[in-house]
Curated annotation (Swiss-Prot):
Gene assigned in the entry: tldD
Matches recorded under PANTHER family: METALLOPROTEASE SLR0863, UNCHARACTERIZED PROTEIN TLDD AND PMBA
GO cellular component labels: cytosol
pH dependence of activity: Optimum pH is 7.0.
Residue interval(s) of motif HEAIGH motif: 228-233
Outcome of substituting residue 228 to F: Abolishes metalloprotease activity. Does not affect homodimerization
Keyword match Transmembrane: no
Name of this protein: Zinc metalloprotease TldD homolog
Organism: Saccharolobus solfataricus (strain ATCC 35092 / DSM 1617 / JCM 11322 / P2)
Superkingdom to which the source organism belongs: Archaea
Family as reported in the entry's similarity comment: Belongs to the peptidase U62 family.
GO molecular function, a single term: protein homodimerization activity
Upper lineage: Archaea, Thermoproteota, Thermoprotei, Sulfolobales, Sulfolobaceae
Subunit structure as annotated in this protein's UniProt entry: Homodimer.
Length: 443
């Protein structure tokens, strides 16, 4: 590949890199009335150059000197591109563990799950169970004499169930992903199904919450999505510059016990493993909030240079066809030192929110999440389950309203979409106690 890098330099490029990627993907989906199986192999190259301080980018299924010339001939921009350059490095890595199962074994495992889902509750009307895995080989080369070779795999399982009793319709879901082997070998699927069953029962019999502002206990799954959606996206440098956080850099936005980071990898089966990003940058911890102070943002090479911040390794692309974007990896709130019982102390009327079903945030810092498992709290005790719960608020106000952080920790994993690109991400945290949060229903 370096001969093509050299060709770009001979043509006047001040920087060039090439990514090669080969992905073997397998998918099995089973619903109440059909089965769908697919396979695919996707393979190709991306070429990127800086020429006259403009970007050039091209995706191709083959690489030749003509492709290099064509990339330079189609540069775009405003002649302001500046990036962080890195020292020479050659590395070969193995990411996670292999998936040693054939197609028949995967289909049989999914049929077993489907038969169990059918018996979770008599009110179930439909379900969708999707298994997906991929085996990948990636290579990265740059004009800095960087060569990074990576092999790995990932597998995921998503289960969506719809149940109806009378005029009450509920939807519950569970998503798991791992890079530590075959997902049925990594997780206790019986526990996953038990969680779904509990949510179906609670949603069907649950009451809607009384709208208003209340003290709230957020469980790790909800803390994870809050950290990802309300903090993480606003801390991606390309979003940050137009959002509410940029002007608050190096200022206090929470108590000194508040710490939020994004890591390339964690010691957890649901961790995403991003040791190098798609710009060949080594991943490092990004201390977004440290002891309550907003410290730094996730960057790619361009925004690292723009902000004067060391590169973080957050440039990720869905495939070789895509220009890399600033994306999260493992975004989480660090545990505190309180027990779970301490968090509930003193709550006369409030809510305990356990599992989200979706969420979104805006660049001005407002967020809203739907909750699929939650309970009313009265006099520090967990009471009846609820359904159709929604929470909303402002990111900075909510951070400042965190009163206590527990010492436990949990992670969730899934997929995040940004500008049409989807990548695997993970998030998590402990239980937290929020002094006041807006709670309501959703339809």
């Amino acid at each position: 590949m370096f001969k093509y890098i050299k060709k770009a330099e001979e043509l006047g490029a001040s920087f060039a890199d090439i990514r090669y990627e080969r992905v073997i993907a397998n998918e099995v989906t089973i619903t109440e009335d059909r089965k769908y199986v697919s396979h695919g192999v996707d393979e190709g190259y991306s070429i990127r150059v800086i020429y006259n301080r403009n970007w050039g980018f091209k995706a191709t299924d083959k690489i030749t000197e003509n492709e290099i010339e064509d990339t330079i001939n189609h540069i775009y921009g405003d002649e302001r591109v500046n990036i962080v350059y890195l020292p020479s490095k050659h590395d070969t890595i193995k990411i996670g563990k292999d998936i040693n199962k054939n197609e028949e074994e995967k289909i049989n495992d999914l049929h077993k799950v489907a038969s169990q889902v059918n018996t979770l509750h008599p009110s179930i009307k439909s379900y969708s169970i999707k298994y997906y895995d991929e085996i990948f080989h990636k290579e990265y080369y740059s004009s800095e004499d960087r060569e990074i070779i990576a092999d790995g795999s990932s597998s995921s399982l998503s289960i969506l169930v719809v149940a109806r009793e009378g005029d009450v319709t509920v939807e519950v879901s569970e998503i798991l992903s791992t890079q530590m082997g075959y997902i049925f070998d990594v997780f206790d699927i019986n526990q996953v199904l038990a969680n779904l069953q509990k949510r179906i029962i609670n949603q069907l019999k649950g009451s809607t919450p009384k709208a208003g502002e209340y003290p709230v206990i957020l469980a790790p799954e909800v803390v994870g999505i809050f950290t990802h959606e309300a903090i993480g996206h606003l801390s991606e440098a390309d979003v940050t510059l137009n959002g509410s956080l940029y002007k608050l850099r190096n200022k206090r936005i929470g108590d000194e016990f508040l710490n939020i980071s994004d890591l390339p990898a964690m010691d957890h089966p649901q961790s995403s493993l991003v040791y190098y990003d798609d710009e060949g940058v080594e991943g490092r911890e990004v201390k977004i909030i440290e002891n309550g102070i907003l410290k730094e943002f996730m960057t790619d090479r361009y925004y690292s240079a723009y902000l004067g911040q060391p590169p973080t390794g957050n440039a990720r692309a869905q495939s070789y066809r895509n220009f890399s974007l600033i994306r999260m990896r493992n975004t989480y709130m660090k545990p505190g030192d309180a027990s779970l019982n301490e968090l509930f102390e003193g709550i006369k009327e409030g809510y305990y929110l356990v599992s989200p079903i979706g969420g979104e945030t805006s660049s001005n810092g407002t967020f809203q999440f739907a909750i699929q498992e939650g309970y009313r709290v009265e006099n520090s005790e967990i009471k009846e389950p609820l359904r159709n719960i929604g929470i909303s608020g402002n990111t900075i106000s909510t951070l400042n309203a965190i009163e206590m952080i527990s010492k436990d920790f949990g992670m969730s994993s899934g997929f995040c979409e940004k500008n049409g690109q989807t990548v695997q991400v993970s998030n998590g945290g402990p239980h937290i106690k929020v002094k006041k949060l807006k709670v309501g229903g959703y339809v």
